[in-house]
């Protein structure tokens, strides 16, 4: 485990480590802790009640953050013909087929998201060893292999976040930046938990959303009372 910095030790002194904070209070704390000279990311870790070693309990999906993420993503689309025109019109940064594949093979990977129409997977499939380790391989489960490339591009540009449970049963994600106000961060966190609830495996037993903690890039984590987040979801439904 990495040693705490002097600043992080000071932050820990302000937190009751056994306390579950209401979401508004937790966000206020991490915004207070985010004092770096850059606009720190606000991150979340969600412990799920799943056994990630079982294939039927792997939680994976995507959610469009209603308030964006504060990051502009470059989007590459593998498609052709009319679909290529639709992708460009929707805001895609790079569109191509074999020519784009050649760029990827040459190491020119200057994009954050890859989308592909189904007919393009014959080309994209050859790039698995390059795109896969970088988390860029298109997948229908997260909406990046689709005939509706225009919507996929718009979603990516609007702040869509992909999530996948790790071996420890934890989902990691970013819900915005320190410069976001509390309501925007809370709205994004609620959207993520809503998406996780919808992705709950049928075989998951017991408490599903077990623990939630938020932190800034350079700050320590603050545990959040799950009910204070999901209460907002209930009010919206």
Curated annotation (Swiss-Prot):
Q: Does the keyword Ribonucleoprotein apply?
A: yes
The protein's GO terms of the molecular function aspect are: rRNA binding; structural constituent of ribosome; tRNA binding
Instruction: Cite the Pfam families for this sequence.
Output: Ribosomal_L1
Where are the disulfide bridges?
Answer: none
**Keywords assigned:** Repressor, Ribonucleoprotein, Ribosomal protein, RNA-binding, rRNA-binding, Translation regulation, tRNA-binding
A GO CC annotation recorded here is: cytosolic large ribosomal subunit
Instruction: Say which domain of life the source belongs to.
Output: Bacteria
Per the UniProt entry, what is one GO biological process?
regulation of translation
Main role? Binds directly to 23S rRNA. The L1 stalk is quite mobile in the ribosome, and is involved in E site tRNA release.
Q: What family is this protein classified in? A: Belongs to the universal ribosomal protein uL1 family.
Summarize the subunit comment: Part of the 50S ribosomal subunit.
Protein's recorded name: Large ribosomal subunit protein uL1
The organism is: Leptothrix cholodnii (strain ATCC 51168 / LMG 8142 / SP-6) (Leptothrix discophora (strain SP-6))
Q: In the record, what lineage is assigned to the organism producing the protein?
A: Bacteria, Pseudomonadati, Pseudomonadota, Betaproteobacteria, Burkholderiales
């Amino acid at each position: 485990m990495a040693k705490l910095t002097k600043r992080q030790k000071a932050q820990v002194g302000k937190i009751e480590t056994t306390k579950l904070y209401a979401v508004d209070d937790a966000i206020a704390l991490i915004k207070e802790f985010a004092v770096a000279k850059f606009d720190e990311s606000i991150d979340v870790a969600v412990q799920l009640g799943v056994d990630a070693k079982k294939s039927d309990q792997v939680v994976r999906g995507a959610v469009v953050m209603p308030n964006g993420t504060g990051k502009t993503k470059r989007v590459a689309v593998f498609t052709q013909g009319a679909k290529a025109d639709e992708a460009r019109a929707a805001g895609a940064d790079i569109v191509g087929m074999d020519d784009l594949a050649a760029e990827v093979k040459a190491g020119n990977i200057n994009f954050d998201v890859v989308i592909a129409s189904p007919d393009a997977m014959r080309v994209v499939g050859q790039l698995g060893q390059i795109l896969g380790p970088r988390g860029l391989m298109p997948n229908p489960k997260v909406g990046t292999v689709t005939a509706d490339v225009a919507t996929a591009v718009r979603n990516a540009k609007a702040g869509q976040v992909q999530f996948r449970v790790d071996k420890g049963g934890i989902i990691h994600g970013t819900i915005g930046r320190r410069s976001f106000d509390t309501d925007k961060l809370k709205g994004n966190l609620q959207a993520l938990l809503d998406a996780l609830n919808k992705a709950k495996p049928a075989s998951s037993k017991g408490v599903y959303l077990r623990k939630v903690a938020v932190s800034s890039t350079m700050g320590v984590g603050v545990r959040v009372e799950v009910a204070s987040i999901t209460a907002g979801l209930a009010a919206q439904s």
